[in-house]
Every structure is written in structure tokens, then in C-alpha cells.
């Protein structure tokens, strides 16, 4: 069960609205797209059997030595099947040559145990815990990557 990543562009971005109507994403995901004020390093659809099942991106601010990873699998029937792990490994392989960063960071809700386990299996480790102003408890994780020089 292999996934592929397809770069999101102006030509295929309209399909993204399908994810925005998924009602349960807000239960475990704070954002479903890169931040507008960030430099997007890579933004992709996660494709399985020729169908977009989610999205993954790396974003950073100019001058930062790290990028932030965002990912979601939109349809619950595709969660827990290893697609997220494949997508994370694939985006790091694809974008590593373009990244001038030392690490990748992410934030996951403490209640999202499945995602936290996925990130750990991809080599991320916890470096902080905090509670957001809306009361949601969050784990911050990071992974050191090899710099391309």
C-alpha cells in the first residue's frame, strides 16, 4: 500500500476545498494548510490509489534554522494504516535537498496519541509540552536532519 505525493499548485488547489468540509478534522487538527506568512518549502497532496487522502507540508520563516511539519489524513478510514509515516519519510526525502535547515519541528495535541506514535516512529522526539490559550494541551516534537551543503 504505497502512497505518492503530488505537489499542490494553482492548477490543482481547487480540490483542496474537499478537505475543508471534513467535519472531524477540527477534533485533532488545528490547521489544514500552511500559514500564509510562512515560506512554504513543500506542500503536497497525499495520494493513495489515485485519490487525495490528505495533505503534508513543510513551512519556515526566512532565516529560521528549522521547518515546521504539518500533516493530516482527511478520511478516518485511511488513518492508522501507515500512510502518514510514508508521507513524512517521502517529504523529507523530496525536500531535503532544498532545505537550509537543521531540524524539523511539529506540534501535536496530547489527545492525538496515534499521530504522536507515528511521529516517534519517524524519529521525532518530544522537547516541550504546553497548554494553548484555548485549553488544548500540545506536545512539541522535533527531528534533527542532515543538512545538505
Task: List each model region and its residues.
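Conserved beta-strand-loop-alpha-helix junction that forms the acyl-donor binding cleft
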Residues: 106-116, 132-137
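Conserved GNAT acetyl-CoA-binding A-motif
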Residues: 97-107
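Acetyl-CoA-dependent GNAT
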Residues: 10-13, 18-78, 94, 98, ...
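Conserved acetyl-CoA pyrophosphate-binding loop and the N-cap/start of the following alpha-helix
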Residues: 78, 82-90
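Conserved N-terminal entry element of GNAT/NAT acetyltransferase domains
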Residues: 1-11, 144-149
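Active-site acidic-Proline motif in GNAT/NAT acetyltransferases
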Residues: 75-77, 81, 110-111
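Conserved active-site alpha-helix within GNAT-family acetyltransferase domains
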Residues: 85, 110-128
Amino acid at each position: 500500500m504505497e502512497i505518492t505525493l503530488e505537489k499542490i499548485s494553482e492548477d490543482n488547489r481547487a480540490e483542496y476545498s474537499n478537505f475543508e468540509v471534513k467535519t472531524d478534522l477540527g477534533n485533532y487538527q488545528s490547521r489544514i494548510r500552511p500559514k500564509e506568512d510562512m515560506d512554504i518549502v513543500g506542500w503536497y497532496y497525499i495520494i493513495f490509489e489515485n485519490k487525495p487522502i490528505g495533505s503534508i507540508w513543510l513551512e519556515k520563516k526566512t532565516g529560521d534554522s528549522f521547518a515546521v511539519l504539518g500533516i493530516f489524513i482527511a478520511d478516518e478510514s485511511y488513518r492508522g494504516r501507515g500512510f502518514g509515516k510514508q508521507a513524512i519519510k517521502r517529504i523529507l526525502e523530496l525536500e531535503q535537498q532544498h532545505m537550509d535547515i537543521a531540524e524539523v519541528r511539529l506540534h501535536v495535541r496530547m489527545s492525538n496519541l496515534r499521530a504522536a506514535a507515528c511521529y516517534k516512529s519517524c524519529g521525532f522526539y518530544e522537547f516541550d509540552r504546553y497548554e494553548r490559550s484555548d485549553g488544548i494541551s500540545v506536545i512539541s516534537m522535533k527531528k534533527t536532519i542532515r543538512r545538505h551543503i
